[in-house]
């Protein structure tokens, strides 16, 4: 089949973009892009890459696609024969033969799919029946976020209020699948609810009094610049919702661990409420240190590039930066909810 043209003539007709998987067949020798160098001062070598389109309207076609390799690795997509990539295919006026094709990104789905498969197998093999139930609970939590939190937030609902509801629903669902209908599950649910409420209140207070805008991240700024949501209050609520959901996992972990430990102690022999309470407090103190470390280190790990970037900034300015204050508030609010679970 003859190669499809990878450029499209100027037209006033409407354009339609789709994304398709392609496989690199060959990579031409790079040549210096003098136009880009003279206009913006960026050193770029332009390659002509021959790509076979594996799906979509151009399936089976071989297209010649320009690929820019610049002096900034952020923008580079380095390919070789056999590399699978995601192609952006722009069709104007339904003229498929004149579609504009560009390399949008690497095709990462297969690697992620294999990683997910290994995770699921490990969960089922070592977790058994309870592991399968836990996976179902996890799937429900993901669906609640994807099909409830995101749509409602985009439709103007307060993200924090929606997140609290989702956290409670997720806690009840998870505890039911993990512990069934039992006193242990009820105790874990109540503990999780207390932790979630405390974390939510702490997050809202620090956002109000600091104050934090919720616009410190690049993603939030892009969302603010779009036509999706314009209200500034939305982003502070979105920040609080993110803090809450980020802490939910460890809060549930602590609640289940303490409830399970106290339940096992109660089975050994008759124990008074005071003795069981003391046992639960002792277990909670032991767990509190490790789980707080888990939460703080998780936020620290995700912010390592930020920490390197700001390491030379004076401490007075550092602590008061919106971006830094947001990360600190997220970690401490979640830890406070964990401690009071």
Task: Give residue ranges: language-model regions.
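Generic detector of multi-pass transmembrane helix bundles and their immediately adjacent loops
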Residues: 200-335
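Extracytoplasmic
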Residues: 19, 46-48, 60, 80, ...
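Short, structured beta-strand/loop micro-motifs enriched in basic residues and often containing a Trp
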Residues: 62-70
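SH3/SH3-like beta-barrel fold
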Residues: 49-54
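Extended, hydrophilic extramembrane loops/domains of integral membrane proteins
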Residues: 71-110
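Structural detector for short beta-strands of small beta-barrel domains
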Residues: 14-45, 85
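Transmembrane alpha-helical segments that form the functional core of multipass membrane systems
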Residues: 117-225, 236-246
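Hydrophobic secretory-pathway targeting helix
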Residues: 1-11
């Amino acid at each position: 089949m003859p190669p499809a043209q990878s450029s499209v003539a100027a037209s006033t007709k409407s354009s339609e973009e789709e994304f398709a998987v392609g496989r690199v067949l060959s990579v031409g020798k790079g040549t210096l892009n003098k136009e880009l160098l003279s206009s913006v001062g960026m050193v770029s070598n332009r390659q002509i890459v021959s790509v076979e389109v594996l799906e979509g309207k151009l399936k089976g076609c071989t297209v010649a696609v320009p690929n820019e390799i610049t002096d900034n690795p952020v923008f580079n997509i380095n390919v070789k024969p056999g590399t699978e990539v995601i192609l952006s295919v722009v069709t104007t006026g339904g003229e498929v033969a004149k579609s504009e094709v560009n390399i949008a990104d690497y095709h990462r789905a297969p690697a992620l799919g294999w990683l997910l498969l290994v995770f699921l197998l490990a969960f089922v093999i070592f977790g058994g029946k309870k592991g399968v139930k836990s996976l179902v609970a996890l799937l429900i939590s993901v669906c609640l976020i994807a099909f409830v939190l995101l749509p409602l937030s985009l439709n103007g609902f307060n993200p924090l209020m929606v997140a609290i509801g989702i956290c409670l629903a997720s806690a009840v669902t998870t505890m039911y699948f993990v512990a069934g209908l039992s006193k242990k599950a009820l105790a874990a649910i109540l503990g999780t609810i207390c932790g979630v409420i405390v974390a939510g209140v702490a997050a809202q207070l620090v956002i109000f009094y600091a104050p934090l805008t919720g616009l410190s991240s690049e993603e939030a700024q892009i969302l603010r610049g779009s036509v999706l949501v314009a209200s500034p209050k939305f982003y502070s609520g979105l920040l609080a919702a993110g803090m809450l959901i980020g802490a939910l996992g460890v809060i549930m972990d602590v609640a289940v661990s303490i409830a399970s430990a106290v339940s096992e102690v109660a089975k050994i022999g008759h124990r008074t409420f005071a003795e069981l309470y003391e046992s639960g407090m002792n277990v909670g103190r032991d767990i509190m240190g490790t789980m707080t470390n888990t939460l703080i280190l998780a936020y620290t790990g995700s912010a390592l590039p930020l920490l390197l970037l700001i390491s030379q900034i004076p401490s007075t300015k550092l602590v008061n930066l919106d971006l830094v204050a947001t990360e600190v508030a997220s970690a401490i609010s979640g830890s406070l909810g964990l401690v009071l679970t």
